[in-house]
């Protein structure tokens, strides 16, 4: 990892990068999560939820299209998962777009919380994800850790722990983990040392790729090839950091395409 300051002296980099969502959006999201927790607790106490129900060994595409009942998709993340950058983060975010692509009977549980770090998500978001017995999990948690200067080895440890707990609960659930886009292309970072920032992005992405390979989960590549911010400035909102609704739609497409390719049977030589 490169040494030096990640940010310029005149523009200190905040530990948690985000604009706060509207009060109504927060209220809706928190009410939904609270209601979900109460429902899960009630069903578990009645013996209506068991570990066996979490298994998902069939085709993801078939299940999502509705042949096996409701399909639960859990999105773990931060402000980018929440939907910051749009007029209505509660409904305009990439997990909602992805859920729509997967099928009409998909039940989305969006756990994205602005400012979230992976270490914090282990105790805040992960327990809800586990109790939900998901059929699909996406994880996009890296940029907050990167800008907060969390050491790569500490970040790797926490991400590894998150995946281990998810797979211990259900070894068959598909899990997609996204990496870090090219932050040097974002207007928000224009005053920062691009070489240091790029080096840190590369270090994080190398760590993410290694952990994804170790756990045999699916890597979602959001680097320039798939999410070209430079060619599509309309993907970025007025804060110079978070995506617009168009940007979120493109991110959802990258997740969906990656998932579809991962589900395809391996070609015979």
Regions found by a protein language model. Name each.
Residues 1-27:
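N-terminal secretory signal peptides that target proteins for export/translocation
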Residues 30-38:
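Sec-dependent signal peptide hydrophobic core
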Residues 44-45:
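C-terminal motif of bacterial Sec signal peptides marking the signal peptidase cleavage site
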Residues 48:
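Short, conserved catalytic or interaction motifs in soluble domains
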Residues 51-114, 126-131:
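Serine-esterase "nucleophile elbow" of acetyl-processing enzymes
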Residues 79, 85-87, 114-117, 144, ...:
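Gly/Ser/Thr-rich beta-alpha loop segments that engage phosphate groups in nucleotides
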Residues 100, 123-267:
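Alpha-helical cap/lid subdomain in secreted, periplasmic
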Residues 109-113, 117-122, 142:
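Subtilisin-like peptidase catalytic core
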């Amino acid at each position: 990892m490169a040494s030096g300051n990640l940010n310029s002296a005149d523009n200190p980099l905040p530990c948690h990068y985000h604009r706060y969502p509207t009060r109504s959006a927060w209220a809706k999201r928190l009410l939904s999560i609270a209601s979900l927790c109460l429902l899960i607790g009630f069903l578990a106490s009645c013996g209506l939820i068991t570990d066996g129900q979490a298994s998902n060994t069939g085709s993801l595409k078939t299940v999502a299209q509705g042949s096996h009942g409701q399909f639960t998709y859990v999105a773990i993340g931060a402000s980018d998962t929440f939907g910051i950058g749009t007029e209505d983060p509660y409904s305009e975010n990439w997990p909602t777009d992805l859920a729509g692509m997967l099928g009409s009977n998909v039940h989305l549980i969006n756990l994205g919380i602005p400012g979230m770090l992976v270490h914090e998500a282990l105790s805040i978001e992960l327990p809800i994800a586990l109790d939900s017995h998901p059929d699909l999990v996406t994880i996009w948690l890296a940029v907050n850790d990167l800008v907060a200067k969390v050491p790569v080895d500490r970040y790797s440890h926490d991400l590894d722990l998150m995946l281990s707990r998810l797979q211990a609960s259900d070894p068959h659930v598909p899990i997609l983990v996204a990496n870090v886009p090219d932050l040097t292309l974002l207007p928000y970072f224009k005053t920062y040392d691009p070489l240091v920032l790029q080096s840190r992005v590369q270090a994080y992405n190398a760590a993410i790729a290694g952990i994804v390979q170790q756990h045999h989960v699916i890597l979602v590549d959001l680097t320039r090839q798939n999410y070209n911010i430079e060619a599509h400035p309309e993907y970025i909102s007025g804060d110079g950091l978070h995506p617009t609704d168009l940007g979120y739609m493109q991110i959802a497409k990258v997740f969906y395409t990656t998932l579809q390719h991962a589900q395809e049977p391996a070609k015979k030589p």
